[in-house]
Amino acid sequence: MSSTLIVQLDMRTLCQEADVTADCVIEIVEHGIVEPSGRTPEDWLFDDQAPLLTRRAAKLHQELELEWEGVALALELLQEVQQLRSENSMLRQRLGRFTQM
């Protein structure tokens, strides 16, 4: 029997895991970088990917002095590049099967 473990973090835990302030998390949420469930910051729950995204967003904002809109765009483009690299790798493997015959 298999079971699925769903991890959800509240605001306090996310702030601790990502080493950011609650105000920073609110900015990140307002710009759609991380999307919690819940209506208010007190009720927000975040998935297990939120700490990594939050940390990356805060780092881009602080170290590169990007506006939050730029941070959102940069993270979206980085995710797209990662997806394209993954697809490219899969297609190369498929192609390799035909060229080795």
UniProtKB/Swiss-Prot annotation:
Transmembrane segments: none annotated. It holds the Pfam family MerR_2. Signal peptide: none annotated. This is Chaperone modulatory protein CbpM. It comes from the Bacteria. InterPro entries: CbpM. Belongs to the CbpM family. Interacts with CbpA and inhibits both the DnaJ-like co-chaperone activity and the DNA binding activity of CbpA. Together with CbpA, modulates the activity of the DnaK chaperone system. Does not inhibit the co-chaperone activity of DnaJ.
